[in-house]
């Protein structure tokens, strides 16, 4: 696992973009696993600013709310259109259909899409309780794409995007933890003290389904980009035989991070 320590949101965005750019430029027909929310916003802005050539890129999104129309500004369909799809020409884009009449069939359909488009790089944020995607504590590590009931803490965290609490969806479709772990490479980003406990568990906690992000301890190719606040609860002995620590200057000045992330 690589840990890239940044000082600002701008550094995080630049570092994340560099890793994505490398995958896009070196793979013939790459597939990117996309995340939503505030964590990847800067990275997507860098993709727009640099006019990244995404004409050969397929995207698969992590999740989508259930029963939230695609044109709703809080849907992840809308989010992706606004952030990327209206700005860059992708080969193909996929987002789970939370409006499907048969949600179980939609989950199976999405698993088929993932099987046909193996993810080269999966972007992840991390919830305050350690969730990845909408996979809450207690989710089996081998879970496929599934329908989940959102916990109260997750709904409260997302309340800022909605006018009132009753507007926040109660369910979502999410790629399962087993689905996420099939990605060839994972990029997880975390900023701020609110993520510190979850980041501590991810990096130095017990491998446990009670903290979904700890599954990444067993993934062979993970890069975590985090600021000092997000890393503030980690012990100083964060680097060991399983984890290498880098800075943004390492990423930009030599190839060590890129090589270990391939």
Curated annotation (Swiss-Prot):
Catalytic residues in the record: 63 (proton acceptor), 129 (for ring-opening step), 131 (proton acceptor), 136 (for ring-opening step)
UniProt cross-references to InterPro entries, sorted A to Z: Glc/Gal-6P_isomerase, Glucosamine6P_isomerase, Glucosamine6P_isomerase_CS, NagB/RpiA_transferase-like
Known pathway: Amino-sugar metabolism; N-acetylneuraminate degradation; D-fructose 6-phosphate from N-acetylneuraminate: step 5/5
GO cellular component labels: cytoplasm
Domain of life, source organism: Bacteria
Name of encoding gene: nagB
Cell cycle keyword on record: no
Enzyme class: hydrolase
EC number: 3.5.99.6
Functional note: Catalyzes the reversible isomerization-deamination of glucosamine 6-phosphate (GlcN6P) to form fructose 6-phosphate (Fru6P) and ammonium ion.
UniProt keyword annotations, A-Z: Carbohydrate metabolism, Hydrolase
Identification of the protein by name: Glucosamine-6-phosphate deaminase
Organism: Bacillus cereus (strain ATCC 14579 / DSM 31 / CCUG 7414 / JCM 2152 / NBRC 15305 / NCIMB 9373 / NCTC 2599 / NRRL B-3711)
Catalytic activity reported: alpha-D-glucosamine 6-phosphate + H2O = beta-D-fructose 6-phosphate + NH4(+)
Family as reported in the entry's similarity comment: Belongs to the glucosamine/galactosamine-6-phosphate isomerase family. NagB subfamily.
Gene Ontology BP term (one): glucosamine catabolic process
GO molecular function, one term: identical protein binding
Record has Nucleus as a keyword: no
Taxon lineage: Bacteria, Bacillati, Bacillota, Bacilli, Bacillales
NCBIfam families the UniProt entry points to: nagB, PRK00443.1-1
